[in-house]
C-alpha cells in the first residue's frame, strides 16, 4: 500500500497521517491536481460522502451514526440511543470495542486527529477551508472528546489544543504549556500563540 492508497482507503489514524504527508508533498511540489484530489478525500473523511466515499471501514460499525453510510467523523447532532456521538471518529473509537456508554477513552482518536489537523493546516495554507467543512467537523471531534468522553489531550497530543485554539478561537480548549510534540507536529504552544 502506498501513501495515496493509505489515504484513500483508511478512515482512521493511518489514513490521516498518510493524508497529511500526501498534501505536504503536493503543496511542496505545487501539484494542484494531487492537492485537489487529496482535499476531496479529506472532505469525504470529514463526512461529505458526495466528495468521497471510497474508504474501507472496519467490521465494527457500532460507533457510526449511520452504519449504512459510514464516515470518518460522525455528523452534528448524531445520537445512538440517547447518547451524543456527533464528532466521534468511529473507526478509531471502535478500537476500544463495540459501542458502550460512557465511552471509553480511546487514544487512537487523538492519533487520528494528529494526522487530520496536520492535513487541515496544509490544506488551509493552500487555499482550502477545511476547518469549516462539515459543520466544523474537526472542532466537533475535539468538543466530543472534551464534553462527552471527558478525555482531554495528554502526552504527545498536547500540541493539538493549541492548534484548535488558533483556528477556532482562544480558549476553545484547555491547553498545556509547555506542550509535547506529537507524531508529526510539535511546539504549537510556541509557534501558535493565542490570537
What is each model feature region?
Residues 1-126:
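Aromatic-lined, polymer-binding surfaces characteristic
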Residues 104-105, 125, 129-195:
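CBM-like carbohydrate-recognition segments
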Amino acid at each position: 500500500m502506498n501513501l495515496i492508497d493509505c489515504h484513500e482507503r483508511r478512515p482512521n489514524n493511518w489514513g490521516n497521517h498518510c493524508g497529511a504527508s500526501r498534501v505536504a508533498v503536493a503543496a511542496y511540489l505545487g501539484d494542484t491536481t494531487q492537492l485537489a484530489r487529496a482535499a476531496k478525500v479529506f472532505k469525504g473523511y470529514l463526512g461529505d460522502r458526495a466528495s468521497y466515499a471510497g474508504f474501507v471501514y472496519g467490521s465494527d460499525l457500532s460507533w457510526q451514526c449511520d452504519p449504512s453510510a459510514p464516515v470518518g467523523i460522525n455528523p452534528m447532532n448524531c445520537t445512538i440511543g440517547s447518547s451524543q456521538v456527533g464528532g466521534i471518529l468511529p473507526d478509531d473509537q471502535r478500537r476500544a470495542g463495540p459501542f458502550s456508554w460512557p465511552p471509553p477513552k480511546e487514544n487512537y482518536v487523538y492519533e487520528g486527529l494528529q494526522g487530520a489537523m496536520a492535513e487541515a493546516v496544509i490544506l488551509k495554507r493552500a487555499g482550502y477551508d477545511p476547518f469549516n467543512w462539515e459543520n466544523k467537523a474537526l472542532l466537533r471531534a475535539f468538543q466530543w472528546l472534551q464534553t462527552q468522553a471527558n478525555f482531554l489531550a495528554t502526552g504527545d497530543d498536547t500540541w493539538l489544543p493549541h492548534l484548535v485554539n488558533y483556528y477556532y478561537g482562544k480558549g476553545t480548549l484547555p491547553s498545556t504549556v509547555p506542550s509535547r510534540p506529537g507524531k508529526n507536529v510539535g511546539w504549537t504552544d510556541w509557534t501558535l500563540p493565542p490570537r
